[in-house]
């Protein structure tokens, strides 16, 4: 399962024997749109968030699950029931720009202060002093930033795929442009606003179908435009990570929201770099980091420098960790939470 990370604490809270034990069927039933809970709309921090819940409000320990890009709260469908059965109040927002949540037109409305402010306002709405926050992909980046900006409101951190990224001496997009070129998608989203949005909107089904794949054959590194061109590929590579009915949930969601709101998160990376200039960069909360060994996102070699209380799990999967290996992901989360209760 696990390849050790150089110069990094190694602890796999999920023994092989534990991972082989099946989760009770009643905790693994939310696997399609008809099983997924109906949303509430909660006004917080100047926006309306579409929020899905499991468990009893105020009757369990709060845990907030934060999706990535291009995703939706539905990405957590396999984890919600199991966490609720373990006594948690599970709160899963479509963050601003996604689903039926508000989509402000001002690009700066998607910076880390606004995104983390939404989550803090959700805690205030429910009357919680703090919560455990779980993030995948861009959701992980939001949870890292949230923990830096509001450390007293974060009890524990669980992040998937994207590790803590140190701030560095130069703004992130400037660094990426120098290293990867101006057609790298992070840079392209910032330097050519609206272009990628239009391509994704015009090829919504193909883009999402081609994105949500696993076991994609190895290939030579592609130019930075490869992600944008993915929207135009007629025959996808690898295998799908979800059923057609599940894919329909994401396609319908982006038909309603478009892609601009989510891409605006990327357009605030340099702004976020400035906003985080004066915060303490060390995260002290107990943290679980879950990597996919086949993920193209690189593992951090300096994680314990900035997150000293981290434990690491490596799963044999790609980027869409909680959807590719839902049972193993849920078990890793539940056992770690039990150990840190």
What are these regions (language model features)?
Residues 20-29:
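Short, Lys/Arg-enriched N-terminal segments with co-localized hydrophobic residues
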Residues 39-41, 90-92, 289, 312-314:
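Conserved beta-strand scaffold positions in the cores of enzyme catalytic domains, especially
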Residues 68, 111, 324-325:
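Active-site helix-initiating loop/hinge in glycosyltransferases
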Residues 47-102:
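Conserved HGGG/HGGXW glycine-rich cap/lid loop of the alpha/beta-hydrolase fold
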Residues 31-38, 48-49, 55-57, 62, ...:
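Flexible "cap/lid" subdomain of the alpha/beta-hydrolase fold that forms the substrate-access gate
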Residues 11-19, 310-341:
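Catalytic active-site module of serine/aspartate enzymes centered on a nucleophile-bearing elbow/loop
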Residues 95, 162, 317:
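Active-site loop/turn elements of alpha/beta-hydrolase fold enzymes
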């Amino acid at each position: 399962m696990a390849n050790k990370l150089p110069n990094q604490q190694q602890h796999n809270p999920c023994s092989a024997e534990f991972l082989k034990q099946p989760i009770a069927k009643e905790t693994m039933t939310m696997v399609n749109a008809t099983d997924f809970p109906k949303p509430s709309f909660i006004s917080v921090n100047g926006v309306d968030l579409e929020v899905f819940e499991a468990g009893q409000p105020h009757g369990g320990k709060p845990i907030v699950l934060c999706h990535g890009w291009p995703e939706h709260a539905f990405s957590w469908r396999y984890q919600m029931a199991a966490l609720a059965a373990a006594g948690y109040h599970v709160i899963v927002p479509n963050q601003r720009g996604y689903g039926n949540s508000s989509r402000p037109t001002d690009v700066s409305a998607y910076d880390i202060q606004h995104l983390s402010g939404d989550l803090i306002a959700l805690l205030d709405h429910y009357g919680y002093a703090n919560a455990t926050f779980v993030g995948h992909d861009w959701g992980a980046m939001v949870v890292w930033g949230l923990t830096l900006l509001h450390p007293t409101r974060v009890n524990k951190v669980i992040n998937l795929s994207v590790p803590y990224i140190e701030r560095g001496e130069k703004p992130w997009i400037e660094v990426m442009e120098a290293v990867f070129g101006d057609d790298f998608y992070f840079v392209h989203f910032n330097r050519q606003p609206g272009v990628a949005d239009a391509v994704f909107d015009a090829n919504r089904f193909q883009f999402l179908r081609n994105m949500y794949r696993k076991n994609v054959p190895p290939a030579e590194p592609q130019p930075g435009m490869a992600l944008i061109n993915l929207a135009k590929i007629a025959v996808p590579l690898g295998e799908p990570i979800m059923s057609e009915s599940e894919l329909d949930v994401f396609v319908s969601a982006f038909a309603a929201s478009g892609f601009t709101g989510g891409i605006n998160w990327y357009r605030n990376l340099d702004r976020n770099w400035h906003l985080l200039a004066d915060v303490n960069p060390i995260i002290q909360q107990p943290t679980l980091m879950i990597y996919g060994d086949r993920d193209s996102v690189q593992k951090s070699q300096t994680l314990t420098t900035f997150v000293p209380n981290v434990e690491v799990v490596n799963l044999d999967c790609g980027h869409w960790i909680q959807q590719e290996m839902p049972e193993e992901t849920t078990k890793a989360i539940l056992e770690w939470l039990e150990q840190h209760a």
